[in-house]
Amino acid sequence: MAAGLGVVAAAGNLLGGLFVVRREWPRRFLHYFMALGAGYMLAVAFTDVIPESVRIGGQGAFLFVLIGYFLVHLFEHILAPHFHFGEETHTEMMRHHRARTVLFGLGIHTFFDGVAIAAGFLVSTWLGTVIFVAIFLHKLPEGFTIASVVLASGQSRGKAVAAAGALGVATLLGVLLTSLLQAQLRYALPLSAGVTVYVAATDLLPEVNREPGWRTALLVFVGVASLLILQHLVRV
């Protein structure tokens, strides 16, 4: 099941890229998905993934949550320049952010998305599913972003779609590699929790906060509430 939903998540990247090359979409559409995803991901991490990590691995799980958080920080800010959603439409920014570098950074990011999905399914179908939903909500924005970057750098529409597809492949690799390491679940699950917190709190929320108005901010809380309601319905 993890592999199947990994394919669906990867398709989200590709679909986001196709949307960009077919027509111009308003930025608020992208931010709505990011806001929902940020709230939902934080709720998943703190109410499901971290408690389950502690149940399996004890108090030592918190160390691996921290390692997961800073592992993504290392890749995004040191090994590859950090890229902000929305910069892709500015030609001047493209002089400083080459498409290949952005693709590498987002590729690392999406690889860890796959790790999180697979680690969740190694624990239970419920946990894997809620993590998948959290990640899928920001798959479209990822595809939007990389396709826009490639187009803004002067490359063809075909290459823009291929770049979005490459992010999908990275997601699948994360799913498959983690699924082969079931014995390391006590480490993989808290690592995925740290990755989830990083993506939601450090990547998505700051971009949501750049958007003026109350609607986008409200969607963060809608994301949190949707998971809490789902938990209540499933566990009653």
Which residues are covered by each model-predicted region?
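Intrinsically disordered, metal-sensing/regulatory segments
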Residues: 1-236
